[in-house]
Each structure stands twice: as structure tokens, then as C-alpha cells.
Amino acid sequence: MSSHSHNGSVGQPLGSGPGFLGWEPVDPEAGRPLQPTQGPGLQMVAKGQPVRLSPGGSRGHPQEQEEEEEEEEEEDKTGSGKPPTVSHRLGHRRALFEKRKRLSDYALIFGMFGIVVMVTETELSWGVYTKESLCSFALKCLISLSTVILLGLVILYHAREIQLFLVDNGADDWRIAMTWERVSLISLELVVCAIHPVPGHYRFTWTARLAFSLVPSAAEADLDVLLSIPMFLRLYLLARVMLLHSRIFTDASSRSIGALNRVTFNTRFVTKTLMTICPGTVLLVFSVSSWIVAAWTVRVCERYHDKQEVTSNFLGAMWLISITFLSIGYGDMVPHTYCGKGVCLLTGIMGAGCTALVVAVVARKLELTKAEKHVHNFMMDTQLTKRVKNAAANVLRETWLIYKHTRLVKKPDQGRVRKHQRKFLQAIHQAQKLRSVKIEQGKVNDQANTLAELAKAQSIAYEVVSELQAQQEELEARLAALESRLDVLGASLQALPGLIAQAICPLPPPWPGPGHLATATHSPQSHWLPTMGSDCG
């Protein structure tokens, strides 16, 4: 199907040539006149953008498609006069979510890359080469480059968050989202991510007091120590990635239910969920990671003042951190510097918290479930019932034996009688004791009703009351209908005698008037016959 240009306005395709009466049609969304066609082909209009399909294929040329995509992007950036629809906003919000997730992943990758390179450079500069070497300078430049990229990714991440805020709240100005709290958090995050060992060799004098001898010690330390240890604060990016990749956070149904119940999906909620699902794994990973990081930090802090290489050795540092984490404190190893003491202090606090969590987790694992509690209580009740029955049977048996050896024999054996009397008293005391134990067991079972069971009983009672109320309302409706029917039946019964009398004794015909008499007089054929009186009167 091809289009041909003519001088007139008849036969022109849509959008080609001048319009009717010499004016050009204007695109309502783009705000510019439609472009005329430049060759044969079918032109289609979608969303105000002309797209030509050539006869040789179902699509246009790649260059034309790229130009059209660029024009659409420019229009999306400049914005049209029409407000965005709900579907457009939802699609834009979903795209922003995906971009934010990718930016968080890239930020974690570059942050971990900087930490790994920092640890490598610190270890190599201590045992292989010096800080003045070219390898150290190259590794520090690599750390600086990864830090710059990380800062850019953090800025882009917060820019996407601001865009999400604007989309969610329907705002137009990004400065509305820039509250003091958000600005402070962004500034703090940028400062944390910006700390890294800069290229070059810088030293300072580090003074400390040795642990056992209390002798002051001074050493020339590298400034990289103070700039390398804070780089572990970048591990907060791991919590952000866990939040954005959590199935609870990405599931739309979960977020909807959380929004209805006023639950905020943040890192704290995800951590609680993980502690509920797999508490042992979470505690193990956290403890081992903290152990390794703290041991390496103590090693770096103590290497300049530990002449005997006790705590500056990695295995020795791990031993010091482990006994501090478990709150044992043998005292065979102690840190010398305030840096090492601070790390040990934080390790002790984390160890106390993790120990409490371990105790709570183990106690919860060892606790019986509701079904297991019911089974255990039933078994104990059954055993107590059997023991009470056996004690009662022993009482009856000893009573019979006492009667037998005292009344049914000619010469009673007093020793045997006393023996059975002793057993009789023991059986009575045992039966009384078992009965008291059973009563106490019943009290414990009554007290074992948890709030969940009470709530369940309350819901069952509410359902029963609701059902009774519905039945009562239905019964009242039936009684009202029955009363109306009884009223109708009573009215019918009251009218029944009159209807019966009317049916048995019909009314006499009306007496003839004067006109009828004259007619009867003049009419020779009419004869009036008197009627006989009847019993009905």
C-alpha cells in the first residue's frame, strides 16, 4: 500500500503535506506541527509520534527508531502539560526501585573491594615492602579510585530515594524531601565512605604505656592505621543490600499487608525476621565475622608497641578477642594501646549481647510446643490416675487381709496382722499424697493456658454468641410472621358464622314498588302468587 502526493487535498495520507485550508496539523502532546512524509510508506500515529512502516519490512529503519527513542526521552525529561497517570507513576516507581537496588549492589561491591585492597596493602607494607614503595602507592591510588566511585554511587542512591519520595507523595520539587534529618544522614554516610588511606607516606608519634611494666613507650606509626580501621564501617552497606534483596521487602503483597498493619519494612524488621527464621545461623555468622575483624584490628593497633609479638600476632589477637568475647579474661594477654583497649571493650559488649541471645535461642529451642505440652500433661495425668487406683486397691487388699487374719482364723498371728496394718496405713498415705499431687497437676494445667489459648476461647465464645443471636433474630421473625397469620385466621373465624348463615338462608327478593304494581295490574299475563312462610323467617 503506497501513498502518492497530489496538488489537491484529496488522497493525501495522514500527516503528509499541508492540512485542510492550508494550515498544518499540530501535535497536541509535543506542541509542534506534524512532520510531512519523505517517501513512500504507511505512516501510523501513536502517542502523537509519527512512525513510518516501509513496504519492505514491518518496522522502520534502526536510525529512525533511535531518533524516535531519543525524542521520547527528551519529552519525558521536559514533561508534557498532562498530569501522569497512575500506571505511569507505578511503572516509574518500579523502575526506580530496580535502579536503587542495582546502585546498592554496586556500592557494596566497591566498598568491599576497597576494604580488601586496604587489608592487602597493610599486610604487604608491614612484611614485604615499605610505605615508600611504588606498589604501596599504586594500591592506595586504587583504594582512592574505588572510594570516589563509592561516593558517586552513594549520591546516586540517595538521588533515587528522593525521586521515590517525590513519586510516592506526588511532589514536584526535590527540595521538599531534603529535611535536616535526611541531609544529616547523607552527610554522615558520605563522611564514613570517604575515610581511606590516602596515597603517600605520613607518620606520627604514637605514645602508649606498656601493660605489665607500666613503662611509657613511643613509636613512629603510619597515619594509615587511623585511616584504615574506620573503613570497616562500610559494612553497613551489607545490611542495606540484605534489606533491598529481602523477599519480604520486594513482595508487593507483603508490603501491602505491612502498610495496612502500620509495619515499616526496614533493616530492623528484616533482622528480626531472620532471627526468628534462622537464629543460629545469624548468630554464628555475626560472631565469626566480628571475631575476625576485631582480631585484625587489635593486631594492627598493637604492632608498633608489642615487642614480643604476643598481641601483634594474628593468632594471639584471635585468642585475646575470644577470651574477651566470652567474658573469661585469663589475663595472659592484654592490649597496650588505647586503640586495642577500645576494640576489646566493644568486643566484650558484643560478647555479652551475643551470649544473652544464645541463651534465649537455646531456651526457646528446648521449650515444649503447645501440642507437646498437652501430650505431656495427658500422659502425666494418666500415670497419676493409675497410681491412685493402685493405691486404692492396696487399701482394699490390706483391709481384707487384716479382716481375714483377725476374724476368719482360729489362732490369729499378731505379727502378720501388724504387717498388714502397716501396709494398710502406707497405702492410705500414698493414696492421699497422690490425690494431692493430682490436684496440683490440675492447677498447673489450668495455669498453663496461655494468652493464645484464651484468645482462641474468646473467639469461640464470640462465634457461639453470634450464632445464638442470629438464631434468636430468626426465631423472632418467625414469631412475628406467625402472629400476623393468627390475626388473619382470627378475622376469618369471626366472619365465618355470617358467611355460613348467608349461604344457608339467602336474602328474600325485594318487594315490588308502585311501578311494578301498575305494570302487574295492566298486564293480564302476570299473576302474583303469595309465598309460603319458611322456618327461616
UniProtKB/Swiss-Prot annotation:
GO terms for molecular function: calmodulin binding; small conductance calcium-activated potassium channel activity. Residues 1-10 have a biased composition (Polar residues). It is a multi-pass membrane protein. Highest expression in brain and liver with lower levels in heart, testis, kidney and colon. In colon, detected in smooth muscle cells. Expressed in atrial and ventricular myocytes with higher levels in atrial myocytes. Residues 1-90 are annotated as: Disordered. It comes from the Eukaryota. GO terms for cellular component: cytoplasm; plasma membrane; Z disc. This is Small conductance calcium-activated potassium channel protein 1. It comes from Mus musculus.
